[in-house]
Amino acid sequence: MSGGGVIRGPAGNNDCRIYVGNLPPDIRTKDIEDVFYKYGAIRDIDLKNRRGGPPFAFVEFEDPRDAEDAVYGRDGYDYDGYRLRVEFPRSGRGTGRGGGGGGGGGAPRGRYGPPSRRSENRVVVSGLPPSGSWQDLKDHMREAGDVCYADVYRDGTGVVEFVRKEDMTYAVRKLDNTKFRSHEGETAYIRVKVDGPRSPSYGRSRSRSRSRSRSRSRSNSRSRSYSPRRSRGSPRYSPRHSRSRSRT
């Protein structure tokens, strides 16, 4: 097999770009996508497969936190007998930059600050177990559709925002009073309601997230940013607009 070409999207920021080394010689762009797609929306995969040298790649995500999750989750990952080296490029990351994807300006976003992409298609979830993280919640709610934001609070409640209104409606109808399992194995039956003036989260700050404090013990950390559903079949990399739920 031969290496894939360069499939470029709009220029991004260095915080979103990661280096992937120690790749097998027959690696393809699609193979790299298969390794990293679950961490978030991928903007660009640049595979370098030069004669006389081992291949390496740069993967650029839409959101810097997705890139960070990918580094934590895939550095040292065994891929067909090759232990991947995944890190931020040596040229350096930016030091906390403003949010992207939703306009410029404003205060710089902290390392674990809220994402820039938000939606009004919001549900409130209650009854979460103490170890439930926003990644767990996002995984659970993806059964209903494309999730663009998820967060949890210390009181066992959380919010989830969907890209489409019909997915929000489906979540309330199908996921209310369903069994939720955290990454630590705790289970609970959760309630799912449309957000509104009477809900616990209405008008509440999203800054009290437990999202990162527990996530580093998980090899498959998830991001709060939008991750489109994925369908397999294309031999080349392209941004996905449909994706099945995965807990692998």
UniProtKB/Swiss-Prot annotation:
Subcellular compartments: Cytoplasm; Nucleus speckle
Modification Phosphotyrosine, positions: 202
Biased amino acid composition, Gly residues: 93-108
Region Interaction with SAFB1, annotated ranges: 198-247
N-acetylserine found at: 2
InterPro entries given in the database record: Nucleotide-bd_a/b_plait_sf, RBD_domain_sf, RRM_dom, RRT5_SRSF_SR, SRSF1_RRM1, SRSF1_RRM2
Consequence recorded when altering residue 93 to A: Predominantly localizes to cytoplasm and fails to modulate splicing of endogenous pre-mRNAs
Modification after translation, per record: Phosphorylated by CLK1, CLK2, CLK3 and CLK4. Phosphorylated by SRPK1 at multiple serines in its RS domain via a directional (C-terminal to N-terminal) and a dual-track mechanism incorporating both processive phosphorylation (in which the kinase stays attached to the substrate after each round of phosphorylation) and distributive phosphorylation steps (in which the kinase and substrate dissociate after each phosphorylation event). Asymmetrically dimethylated at arginines, probably by PRMT1, methylation promotes localization to nuclear speckles.
Ranges of compositional bias, category Basic residues: 205-248
Phosphoserine: residues bearing it: 2, 133, 199, 201, 205, 207, 209, 231, 234, 238
SMART domains from the UniProt entry: RRM (SM00360)
Location of the RRM domain: 16-91, 121-195
Outcome of substituting residue 183 to R: In NEDFBA; uncertain significance
Family annotation (CDD domains): RRM1_SRSF1 (cd12597), RRM2_SRSF1 (cd12767)
Residue numbers spanned by region Disordered: 88-134, 191-248
Keyword Transcription in record: no
Positions where Asymmetric dimethylarginine occurs in the chain: 93, 97, 109
Result of altering residue 109 to A: Predominantly localizes to cytoplasm and fails to modulate splicing of endogenous pre-mRNAs
Subunit structure: Consists of two polypeptides of p32 and p33. Identified in the spliceosome C complex. Component of a ribonucleoprotein complex containing mRNAs and RNA-binding proteins including DDX5, HNRNPH2 and SRSF1 as well as splicing regulator ARVCF. In vitro, self-associates and binds SRSF2, SNRNP70 and U2AF1 but not U2AF2. Binds SREK1/SFRS12. Interacts with SAFB/SAFB1. Interacts with PSIP1/LEDGF. Interacts with RSRC1 (via Arg/Ser-rich domain). Interacts with ZRSR2/U2AF1-RS2. Interacts with CCDC55 (via C-terminus).
Physiological role: Plays a role in preventing exon skipping, ensuring the accuracy of splicing and regulating alternative splicing. Interacts with other spliceosomal components, via the RS domains, to form a bridge between the 5'- and 3'-splice site binding components, U1 snRNP and U2AF. Can stimulate binding of U1 snRNP to a 5'-splice site-containing pre-mRNA. Binds to purine-rich RNA sequences, either the octamer, 5'-RGAAGAAC-3' (r=A or G) or the decamers, AGGACAGAGC/AGGACGAAGC. Binds preferentially to the 5'-CGAGGCG-3' motif in vitro.
Illness: Neurodevelopmental disorder with dysmorphic facies and behavioral abnormalities: An autosomal dominant disorder characterized by developmental delay, intellectual disability, speech delay, hypotonia, behavioral abnormalities, and non-specific dysmorphic facial features. Some patients have variable skeletal and cardiac anomalies.
UniProt comment concerning the protein's domains: The RRM 2 domain plays an important role in governing both the binding mode and the phosphorylation mechanism of the RS domain by SRPK1. RS domain and RRM 2 are uniquely positioned to initiate a highly directional (C-terminus to N-terminus) phosphorylation reaction in which the RS domain slides through an extended electronegative channel separating the docking groove of SRPK1 and the active site. RRM 2 binds toward the periphery of the active site and guides the directional phosphorylation mechanism. Both the RS domain and an RRM domain are required for nucleocytoplasmic shuttling.
Record's protein name: Serine/arginine-rich splicing factor 1
Naturally occurring in which organism (per UniProt): Homo sapiens (Human)
